[in-house]
């Protein structure tokens, strides 16, 4: 039942800690719904029970001004719920911020309006993050211009990218496939087009891909190599629409 609800509300879970985040969300959601229904039901019930009816004499309610049992419940139940949420949340948070020692480190750079990914062996990809499955991946994020935010929904991973500063996030992908990456911080006219893909491969396939990364350029003529580097590194002005007043 919970798995079906998760699939309905969220993208699929493709990281080791995605289920922790989703389960915590649903715990908070259902706890809030339960408390809401209890309060609303109590208000409606008491409003109906003690409403004044025509032809009846006014009835005085009980003169009892407090209940130790009710007051204890009003304190203890929220305390238990908040304590569970705190412990659950801090454990999930620590899983998300403590990077395993054996993680593959990849540098992520945001720039208006595309992403570049620099790999340990010196290779670079544009708008395609390639990672192995069942292997922790550490992303070191920064920006060349304005504030961006790097978000992989299926990994439940999101982190801001700031100029002159490095932020770190990590994930361990559990399923091979191609998934979406978004920028979730408004960064200019091309913000909505600043998407990318994360490609999760089997470890052996990733090792083969990584060993060939960059080597395909070795035999290229210099003019073709220069054109390829320009395409990878230069800003794509096809995404840039300047107002006519800019030229005035």
Where are these regions (language model features)?
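Short pre-active-site segment immediately N-terminal to redox-active cysteine/selenocysteine motifs
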Residues: 182, 233-234
């Amino acid at each position: 039942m919970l798995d079906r609800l998760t699939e309905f509300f969220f993208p699929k879970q493709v990281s080791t800690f995605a289920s922790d985040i989703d389960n915590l969300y649903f715990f908070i959601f259902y706890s809030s719904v339960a408390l809401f229904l209890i309060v609303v039901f109590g208000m409606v019930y008491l409003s109906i029970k003690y409403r004044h009816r025509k032809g009846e004499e006014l009835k005085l309610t009980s003169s009892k001004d407090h209940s130790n049992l009710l007051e204890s419940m009003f304190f203890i139940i929220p305390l238990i719920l908040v304590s569970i949420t705190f412990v659950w949340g801090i454990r999930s948070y620590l899983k998300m911020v403590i990077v395993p020692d054996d993680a593959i480190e990849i540098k992520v750079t945001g720039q208006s309006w595309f992403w570049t990914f620099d790999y340990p062996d010196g290779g670079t990809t544009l708008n395609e993050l390639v990672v192995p499955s069942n292997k922790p991946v550490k992303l070191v994020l920064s920006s060349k211009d304005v504030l961006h935010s790097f978000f992989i929904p299926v990994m439940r991973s999101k982190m801001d990218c700031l100029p002159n500063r490095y932020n770190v996030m990590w994930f361990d992908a559990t399923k091979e496939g191609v998934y979406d990456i978004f920028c979730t911080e408004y960064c200019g006219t091309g913000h909505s087009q600043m998407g990318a893909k994360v490609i999760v491969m089997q470890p052996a396939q990733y090792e083969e891909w990584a060993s060939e990364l960059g080597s395909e350029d070795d035999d290229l003529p210099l003019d073709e190599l220069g054109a390829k580097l320009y395409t990878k590194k230069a800003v794509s002005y096809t995404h840039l629409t300047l107002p006519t007043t800019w030229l005035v």
